[in-house]
Amino acid sequence: MTKNSIAVTMRYDYFYNGKEVRNGIDFNLINWVYNLGYTPHLVPNDIRYFKIIKKNKFAGFILSGGNDINIKTTRVLLENKILKLSIKDKTPVLGICHGMQIMNRFEDGNLTRVSNHVQKYHKLCDNEFEYPNKVNSFHKYGIKRLGKNFEVIAYSNDNQIEAIKHRKHNWLGWMWHPERDKIFNKKLIKIAKNFFKKKKI
């Protein structure tokens, strides 16, 4: 089963003034993974669940968006373990927004606060690949120092880093949310399909 599945991490959703904390994921991200031809396997924010992840061979991982990075949260600890596992098993990892930030930080990069990048659309510039002309933006932090062995493959028109890939590992990072487009972008679907098939993109 898992060879046709992609494991997807989830965000924290807080209710009742923080007294109740839930695992959360956008239904559209689930649909987006199905559009890639895979079954999404949702990963709860529980470090004990990593034992299950290690026992299975997924086609890939998606570190999803949502939540600013707090290095002490179980989510971040779990996502770091997933990145380490992906290096060992050579499993593709796609980082979406928060997920791309986690990848960058894992390789000693850091972030800086940015303005005008929440609920906006930005043009992409200096694209290495056939990305769309415009992408959505829902983040308060951008990359200040690029992590080791990463290269930038797309900038926004205001010179913010929007997409990165790793030179050694099969890691790809997007600062935008492909699942939040009203109609899923066909170019992104094609890029992601090839990526999880471990083809060169």
Regions found by a protein language model. Name each.
Residues M1-H98, F106, T112, Y121-K123, ...:
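N-terminal beta1-alpha1 cap of cysteine-dependent amidohydrolase-like domains
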Residues G99, H139:
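A generic "binding-loop/recognition-motif" signal
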Residues R113-S137:
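An acidic, glycine-rich "communication" segment
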Residues N136, G142-R145:
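Substrate-binding strand-loop-helix patch
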Residues L172-W174:
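Residue-level marker for buried hydrophobic side chains located in beta-strands
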